[in-house]
C-alpha cells in the first residue's frame, strides 16, 4: 500500500506547501481514498499488509515479525555459517534485477536477498521516491550539452550522452519484454504506461536551446520520431499539453518537442514483481534483516546480519559473490568490506519534496511528462518537471522536485550516515568537491527556505492556472551523489550518475550514485555480471542466454550498447509486449 502523502499530511511535522491563507481543508471528498494506492502485494502477504511512511523525519513503519516470517533466523540456529552462492544487499530495483538475472542464468545457485525494512522497494525504488520516468533522453535537457560560440550564442547541442541513455533504457525494455514472455512479470499495465515525453522551453533562451536540441537529435535514428511545436504553433502546443498552455501570456514564447515512445514507470510495482519472480525461481528474500558486517574469508565473504524487528538473532553466511544494491548505504557497505577500490569515494545526499495533485479533473488534462531546463549547475534530480504518474494504479500529477539537503544517505537512514562515511582517504575529495560546488548548496538552500507562495509560483511557471488547493507536498526520496577524485586533476569532484565499483577478483560489487538510476537497472546488472564473471568458467555458457534476454547484447561491447540493432524494431516489439505502443 502506497500512502505517502496521506501520512505526510497527517503528521504535525509534515512540510506545508502553502501558507495558512491557502487552506487545505476544502479538498474535495474522496481525496484521501484516491491517494491510498493499493496494489497486488503478493510478496508481503506472509506478513500482512504494509504502508509506506512519508514523514521525512519519521522512521520506517514498525512491524513485529512472527516466528515464521521472512525475517526469521531460526534456519541458522544449527549452523553458525551457511554457504550460499550470492548475497544481494537491499531489495530495491537494482538487487531485484541482478538477483533475478543471475537466478535465470544459474537456477541451482543459492541466492539470498537481504532487506532491512518490512518490504522491498521502500527506499528510492518506491513510486513516490523517484521520478518514475523511463529515462530515454527524450525530454531531459541535462543529457544534452550546449556548445556555444565565442560571443555566448548557442551553436549546437551534442548528443553522445543522450544516445547512450536512450540505448540503456531500451535494454531495460528488452529485458522486461523477455520477463513478461517468460511469465516472470505480471500484466505490464501494472508497472509501465505509454506517456508522451515533452521537452519544454520557456522564454527566448530556452526556446533557442530546444530548437537546437531538436535539430541535433532528430538526425539520430533513436529520436527520428521527435516532433516540434514552435512558438507560433499555439494550436499544436495546446493539443500536446493543455495545462502548460491554458492561461499563459500569449506574448511569452514557448517551444516544445514531443516523442510518443515515452513511458511512465512505477518502479516500486516493478521491483516487487521482480522480487516475486526471484522468489518463485527459488531465491531467498529475508526482510527485517540489516547487514552489519562484510568480511573477507579467502575467496569468499562472510556477511553478518541481524534481525531489525527483534534486535536479536545474529546470522552469518559465506557468499562467493556479494552485490551491494543498498542505495546510498552502498558506500557504507563497501567501506565495511574494506576493498581498496572504494577509497577516495564519498557521497553528497540530496533530498527534496514533490508537489502532488490528485484532482481527477486536472490529472485528466495532463497525460504527459514535461521537462524544462533547470538552473545552471543544478543536479539531475532537481530539474523541474510536471509529470503524469500512475503509482499503485492511481493517477496523480507530480511537480518538482523542490531540492533540500540532508545527512541521511537513505530516506529511512540515519542523520549520522554522512559522518560515518567520512574517512581519511576521502576527506580531501569531499572538501574539494564541496568547495567547487557551492552554487549547488546555495540553490538547495534557496529551495529549503522558499515560501509556499514561491513554490506555487514555480508550479505556475509550468501550469499557469494551478490552484493552491489542489497541491500538497510529499517527500521525494534521497539521492546520494558521488564524490570522488577527478582522474585528470586529482582534485575532488561531484559526479552525477551511477558507477559500478568492484574489487580485483570480482567477488564483491556495489552501485554508487543516482540518476538515471532505476531506468538503467538492466544495464547496471549487465555491467555487474560482465565485470565480475567474465573471467569465470560459467560466463561462456551465460553469454548466449544473456543475448536471448537482451537481443543485440555482446560480451565484447559496453553494457547497454545497442548501436548495432534496429531501434524501430525494438520500439515495435517491446511496445507490443509491454502494451506501450503509441496510440
Predicted regions, residues:
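N-terminal Rossmann-like FAD-binding beta1-loop-alpha1 element of flavoenzymes
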Residues: 84-112
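Glycine-rich FAD pyrophosphate-binding loop
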Residues: 103-127
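Dinucleotide-binding Rossmann-like beta1-alpha1 core, especially the glycine-rich loop
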Residues: 131-242, 395-396, 406-408, 414-418
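Short beta-strand to alpha-helix junction loop
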Residues: 161-172, 200-209, 257-279, 286-288, ...
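Flavin (FAD/FMN) cofactor-binding and adjacent substrate-gating region
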Residues: 187-194, 202-276, 280-281, 286, ...
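C-terminal catalytic lobe of FAD-dependent flavoproteins
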Residues: 255-258, 269, 409-538
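Helical element adjacent to the flavin cofactor pocket in flavoenzyme catalytic cores
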Residues: 256-321, 326, 519-533
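Flavin (primarily FAD) binding-site architecture
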Residues: 324-339
Amino acid at each position: 500500500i502506497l500512502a505517502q502523502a496521506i501520512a505526510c499530511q497527517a503528521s504535525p511535522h509534515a512540510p506545508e506547501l502553502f501558507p495558512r491563507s491557502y487552506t487545505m481543508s476544502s479538498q474535495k471528498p474522496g481525496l484521501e481514498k484516491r491517494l491510498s494506492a493499493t496494489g497486488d502485494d503478493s510478496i508481503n502477504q506472509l506478513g500482512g499488509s504494509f504502508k509506506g511512511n512519508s514523514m521525512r523525519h519519521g522512521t520506517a513503519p514498525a512491524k513485529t515479525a512472527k516466528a515464521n516470517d521472512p525475517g526469521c533466523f531460526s534456519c541458522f540456529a544449527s549452523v553458525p555459517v551457511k554457504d550460499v552462492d550470492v548475497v544481494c544487499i537491499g531489495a530495491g530495483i537494482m538487487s531485484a534485477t541482478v538477483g533475478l538475472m543471475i537466478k535465470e542464468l544459474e537456477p541451482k545457485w543459492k541466492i539470498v536477498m537481504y532487506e532491512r525494512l518490512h518490504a522491498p522497494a521502500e527506499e528510492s525504488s518506491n513510486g513516490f521516491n523517484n521520478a518514475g520516468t523511463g529515462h530515454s533522453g527524450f525530454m531531459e535537457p541535462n543529457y544534452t550539452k550546449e556548445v556555444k560560440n565565442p560571443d555566448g550564442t548557442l551553436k549546437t547541442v551534442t548528443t553522445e550522452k543522450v544516445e547512450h541513455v536512450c540505448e540503456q533504457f531500451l535494454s531495460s525494455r528488452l529485458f522486461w519484454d523477455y520477463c513478461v514472455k517468460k511469465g516472470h512479470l505480471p500484466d505490464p499495465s501494472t508497472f509501465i504506461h505509454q506517456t508522451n515525453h515533452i521537452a519544454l522551453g520557456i522564454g527566448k533562451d530556452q526556446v533557442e536551446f530546444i530548437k537546437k536540441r531538436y535539430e541535433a537529435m532528430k538526425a539520430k535514428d533513436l529520436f527520428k520520431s521527435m516532433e516540434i511545436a514552435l512558438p507560433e504553433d499555439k494550436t499544436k502546443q495546446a493539443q500536446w499539453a493543455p495545462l502548460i498552455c491554458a492561461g499563459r501570456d500569449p506574448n511569452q514564447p514557448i517551444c516544445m518537442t514531443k516523442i510518443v515512445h515515452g513511458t511512465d514507470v512505477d518502479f516500486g510495482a516493478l521491483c516487487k514483481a521482480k522480487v516475486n519472480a526471484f522468489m518463485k525461481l527459488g531465491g531467498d528474500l529475508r526482510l527485517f534483516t540489516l547487514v552489519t558486517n562484510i568480511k573477507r574469508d579467502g575467496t569468499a565473504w562472510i556477511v553478518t546480519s541481524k534481525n531489525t524487528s527483534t534486535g536479536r538473532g545474529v546470522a552469518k553466511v559465506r557468499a562467493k559473490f556479494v552485490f551491494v544494491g543498498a542505495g546510498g548505504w552502498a558506500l557504507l557497505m563497501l567501506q565495511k568490506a574494506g576493498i581498496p577500490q572504494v577509497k577516495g569515494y564519498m557521497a553528497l545526499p540530496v533530498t527534496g519534496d514533490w508537489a502532488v495533485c490528485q484532482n481527477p479533473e486536472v490529472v485528466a488534462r495532463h497525460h504527459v511528462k514535461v521537462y524544462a531546463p533547470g538552473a545552471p549547475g543544478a543536479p539531475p534530480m532537481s530539474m523541474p518537471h510536471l509529470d503524469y504518474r500512475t503509482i499503485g494504479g492511481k493517477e496523480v500529477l507530480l511537480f518538482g522536485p523542490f531540492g533540500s539537503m540532508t545527512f541521511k544517505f537513505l530516506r529511512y537512514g540515519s542523520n549520522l550516515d554522512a559522518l560515518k562515511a567520512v574517512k581519511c582517504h576521502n576527506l580531501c575529495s569531499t572538501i574539494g568537491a564541496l568547495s567547487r560546488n557551492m552554487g549547488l548548496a546555495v540553490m538547495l538552500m534557496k529551495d529549503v527556505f522558499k515560501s509556499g507562495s514561491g513554490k506555487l509560483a514555480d508550479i505556475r511557471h509550468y501550469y499557469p492556472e494551478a490552484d493552491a488547493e489542489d497541491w500538497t507536498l510529499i517527500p521525494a526520496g534521497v539521492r546520494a551523489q558521488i564524490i570522488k577524485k577527478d582522474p585528470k586533476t586529482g582534485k575532488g569532484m561531484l559526479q552525477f550518475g551511477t558507477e559500478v565499483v568492484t574489487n580485483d577478483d570480482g567477488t564483491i560489487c556495489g552501485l554508487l550514485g543516482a540518476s538515471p538510476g532505476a531506468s538503467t537497472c538492466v544495464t547496471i546488472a549487465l555491467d555487474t555480471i560482465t565485470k565480475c564473471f567474465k573471467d569465470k568458467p560459467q560466463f561462456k555458457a551465460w553469454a548466449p542466454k544473456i543475448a536471448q534476454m537482451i537481443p543485440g547484447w555482446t560480451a565484447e561491447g559496453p553494457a547497454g550498447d545497442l548501436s548495432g540493432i534496429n531501434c524501430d524494431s525494438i520500439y515495435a516489439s517491446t511496445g507490443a509486449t509491454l502494451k506501450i505502443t503509441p496510440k
